[in-house]
Structure formats: structure tokens, C-alpha cells
């Protein structure tokens, strides 16, 4: 990795009452742009959630700027690195929720599950009385998860409450352990489950990313790679970039064995979207792929000037 061009990727969130969140949008965006930072930050009445990338100095400056607000002074973040900028632009968006469960009455500022550190996680999920639930979407679970974890097979986090209502019983499932990418979805999910009468609800502090950062591979109960929402696609232990790519057509993460499928055609289809492609859709996708390659070839040529 070229140290001079290394991008620091910082992910952070905090559930905290921000009644003035709309007033923070413009000055925060201006400061990030001045620091040559790219990424996305979400602001809502319930808190802040963001992933940004830039130089070491710029990231430190933005985090200091955020923490200057006393409500965010203990804002925690996780870091990883990227060889190239993982984001194309900087956005600061106003939202109803910083992670969308679709139930505004669920408030992690009022109640939340018990945090479990990465060092304590293996022992917890090895307990046969504990049901372990991956709160992420099905396409994320597809490329990696913890041993023995349940996959709710959701397409959206909004689907999670219905999964709980249909499949879990507070009287039967006494101990529940949950995890997600960085921890934010589990804050909402654990708050929801407590409201449904589940007594012992645990979640992985810092999420999968903190676990992969702190737990060595030889001690790990993680299997596969962890999907991330930027151009790295996936990361492994030590938060090093993984090997997965995205299908250009449907966006599903693909391993090398997925690309060996007869239904895979670069830029056109994979086994997850092949059956949904009509001849008309295939023709449009071929043109879309051609335009993408043309654009990239022009960009590459300009970079050599």
C-alpha cells in the first residue's frame, strides 16, 4: 500500500438527542469540503451516523470538529485504510432516522441491549442457550457471518421487526445475541427487542468491524468476509480489503466461485439476476456496460496526461 496516498476511512455513529440537527447540515458540509473529505454523514433528531475518507490530518480535523459539540464529545469511531478514495463526493443528509427501522417509537437513547466486547463475544455465542442473530441483510450475510448465527433473510432492516414477531418468542428465547457491521443496527434492534419483552439482549460492541480489527484469525469465530458500503466491497481480519466484487447489473457481492458460474457475464449478469433478465433488459444492460467501459477508458487516458 502506498503510504503517501493511503486513505483513512472513519466510520462513526452516536444515538444522542439533536433537536437542532437541521442547523448543523450546512456548516458541517462546508467544513468537510474544506478538508477535502468525501463520504456520507446522516443527521437526525436521534443522532449522527457517517463514514468518511480522506488524509490522516483531514480525518482528525473533522472528528475534532464533531467532538467540539459537547453532545458528541465521546463520539467513537473505527478506522480502516484504502489504497484509493472509496467515495466520490461528500454528502451531509437530513433523515428521520440515522438507521431506518421504520418504528419511530424505538429509541436507543431510552433503552438498549447489553454491550459485549469483541474479547467477550466468542464465549457468549458459544453458549448453547444463546440464539445468535445476524441483523444484516441477506446479501451481506451471503459473504460472511459468525459460526452458528441465524440469518433472518431480510432485504431491508425494516423487515427485521416482522422477522422477530414471526420467529422469536420471549418465553422461549431467553438469551439473544446480535451483531451487525458497525453496531448501529443492533442498537435499534436491541431496543426493539427489549420493547417486545425479551429479557436478555446482547449485541457486539463496535460490530463485526471492531471484532475483525481486534481478534486474531486463529482465535476468530468469523467465517468469510464482511461486506462494507464503499468501493472496497468487503474486508477481512485486520480490516484489510477482501476479494469480493459487485455484480455490475444487480449489485450483489460476488466471490471468485460466483464468477465461475455459466450465468455470470461481466457487466451483464450473475447467478443472482440472470433469471430476471429479459432480452430487452439484457440489451439495455449491455449498452450500460459499454458506456461504463468507455467512460472509464477516457478517465484512465486523462489521468496519464
Curated annotation (Swiss-Prot):
E.C. number: 1.14.-.-
Enzyme class: oxidoreductase
PROSITE patterns in UniProt: RHODANESE_3
Cited Pfam families: Rhodanese, UPF0176_N
Residues annotated as the enzyme's active site: 180 (cysteine persulfide intermediate)
Start and end residues of each Rhodanese domain: 126-220
PANTHER family from the UniProt entry: RHODANESE-LIKE DOMAIN-CONTAINING PROTEIN 7-RELATED, THIOSULFATE SULFURTRANSFERASE/RHODANESE-LIKE DOMAIN-CONTAINING PROTEIN 2
Summary of the function given for this chain in its UniProt record: Catalyzes oxygen-dependent 5-hydroxyuridine (ho5U) modification at position 34 in tRNAs.
Keywords carried by this UniProt record: Oxidoreductase, tRNA processing
Key word Electron transport present: no
Gene Ontology BP terms: tRNA modification
Reactions it catalyzes: uridine(34) in tRNA + AH2 + O2 = 5-hydroxyuridine(34) in tRNA + A + H2O
Encoding gene (name): trhO
Protein name as annotated: tRNA uridine(34) hydroxylase
SMART domains: RHOD (SM00450)
Family named by the database record: Belongs to the TrhO family.
